[in-house]
Regions:
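Short, low-complexity N-terminal tether/leader segments at secretion or assembly junctions of large
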Residues: 1-33
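Collagenous Gly-X-Y triple-helix signature in extracellular proteins
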Residues: 36-296
């Protein structure tokens, strides 16, 4: 009887269910299970191209659909951890690979900035990306910088913007992405740490400034851990906030952050292979990038 929908009395059918109530109850159970899995870091994510296949048919591709959804601030049904697979062909500087880009945060910086930022979704790769060519070390890794120095210069006071990592992200990885992905990306402007003095190397930030990161960028320590572990509070934090996808830092992979260490004139921040907040010399050659972008 649990699946019965009608009774027939003298040839007349009478509904005995409230389908709307059943649908709402089913959705509530699904949402509760999602919340449980998300709270313990066990939500595997869903392929957005499959979940919203019928809706996506109205657009040229899944990325055009996602961008339209974001611009209308329609996030219905989209969950942190849901993903889109991106097939990247081999280029001179990027290895052939499929990168699973997950929803890492929804509108984390909406209306923030010296120019207010519009609606956006931060897309974060589920794992690191393999490098090749002149910038690759140990086959597929990359140095943050070729010198053991985390300071800026008189011309560019922000250390990250001087890094080999940032150059590779915007000059090589961006162009390796399929055209439909590139078309959906919003440039990212942030409040970035400066570290420069004409009198010598610094172990502390010297200030901050609004800077364009371009379309591809590495995460900050705060965006991953929600706090400053090795980077400095204040100038080293800017307007950053933790991305919900990193409430559980269970992954044992080693990857670079854009933050620099607050207790050294040479070290930069990274996520250690034990899942811990860590630091390394920028010349260390066993760390990979985890390049992110905004859709909007």
């Amino acid at each position: 009887m649990a699946d019965a929908k009608t009774f027939n009395v003298n040839g007349a059918n009478y509904s005995i269910i409230d389908q709307t109530a059943r649908d709402n109850a089913s959705k509530a159970m699904q949402d509760a299970e999602y919340s449980r899995l998300e709270s313990i870091g066990a939500y595997p994510g869903r392929d957005l191209a499959t979940v919203f296949a019928e809706e996506i048919k109205q657009k040229a591709n899944v990325w055009e659909w996602l961008r339209a959804r974001v611009r209308s601030a329609n996030y219905s049904g989209i969950r942190i951890g849901d993903y889109i697979d991106v097939v990247i062909p081999q280029t001179a500087q990027v290895a052939s690979q499929t990168v699973r880009y997950a929803v890492g945060a929804i509108d984390p910086y909406y209306q923030c900035g010296d120019t207010a930022k519009g609606h956006h979704i931060a897309m974060v790769p589920k794992s690191t990306v393999a490098v090749r060519g002149p910038n690759a070390v140990n086959d597929s890794y990359i140095q943050w910088r070729k010198t053991a120095d985390n300071n800026g210069t008189n011309e560019q006071k922000c250390p990250y913007l001087l890094s080999q990592l940032h150059e590779w992200e915007n000059e090589h990885f961006l162009s390796a992405l399929p055209a439909e992905v590139q078309a959906a990306i919003m440039p990212h402007r942030v409040l970035l740490e400066e570290r420069y003095s004409s009198s010598g190397k610094l172990t502390e930030p010297s200030g901050w400034s609004w800077q364009d990161l371009g379309k591809i960028w590495s995460l900050s320590e705060v965006e991953v851990y929600g706090l400053n572990a090795w980077s400095k509070p204040g100038y080293g934090t800017g307007f950053d906030c933790q991305f919900p996808i990193f409430k559980q830092t269970k992954d044992r992979i080693h990857w670079w952050l854009r933050s620099v260490s607050g207790s050294s004139s040479s070290d930069v921040c990274c996520v250690g292979s034990y899942g811990i907040a860590y630091y390394n010399s920028p010349t260390y050659d066993w760390v990979r990038p985890r390049p992110c972008f905004l859709v909007g």
